[in-house]
Amino acid sequence: MIVSGLSGSGKSVALKTFEDLDYYCSDNLPVELLPDFVKSRLRGNPIGNQRLAVGIDVRSRSDLTQLAQWRLAAQEYGIEALLLFFEASDEALIKRYADTRRRHPLSHLGLALPEAITRERQLTEPLRVQADAIIDTSTLNVHQFRRRVVTEFALGSNDRLSLLFESFAYKRGVPAEADFVFDARVLPNPHWDPELRPLTGRDAGVRNYLDNEADVRRYSTQIVDLLDTWLPRLRNDTRSYVTIAFGCTGGKHRSVYMAERMARHAREQGWPEVATFHREQD
């Protein structure tokens, strides 16, 4: 996976999302070093078992036109290199820079921000024209953006059903795109334990606390029975992924724990594409 685009459009968020899904990621890699990087990662490992994501943009200060030649050569070795190009409107980019107070990568040229954005569009045009997908992030918040990366690109091809286990806080609303929704507020709440309150459902302390609760074990068993029965029936559906969402009060402990627990179970059952997304944490 090659991640490129305009500075401020979300490339770093995309790479972090791929990293969370067990991709080996490298950012700001010069194009001329890409072949050696890929070879080093594939050495001694089957191509099908390697998931790489590389960030390439104007910071690399290399000849971006070389990328098309490398992608053609990579196909001969059975390497699929999908190029994603992220962009946003000038207005959205200027607002993001104002909010974060970061400097544009081309500011060293003595350009004002609008001129730097225009210049970057020109420099990255060789990448944009060969992109497999162009994603405009102007109107997306970070949660919508991460979800789109996960569901459309990171989970794999559309010829097999992928599972996305999500956690959320009810006070912020139920995810509209969820196919299954389970209420974890019926479970004991680690929030009331002062030592567990600052942790999340991914931390060992919270996991141990909930693992030892009889109601949690019963709740988990019943959900496993339901999902194991009905998820396989969806394999013949036209959809490419299914979202299973767990909600609790704050989206921090119980819902995160259940999403992670069910994702582990799905992987143990042999589902090839499984991801987690914690809306209030990621």
UniProtKB/Swiss-Prot annotation:
Residues annotated to bind GTP: D57, V58, R59, S60
Keywords on record: ATP-binding, GTP-binding, Nucleotide-binding
GO MF entries: ATP binding; GTP binding
Residue positions binding ATP: G5, L6, S7, G8, S9, G10, K11, S12
Pfam family, one: RapZ-like_N
Signal peptide residues on this chain, from the entry's feature table: none
Assigned protein family: Belongs to the RapZ-like family.
Record function comment: Displays ATPase and GTPase activities.
Name of the featured protein: Nucleotide-binding protein XOO1280
Source organism (scientific name): Xanthomonas oryzae pv. oryzae (strain KACC10331 / KXO85)
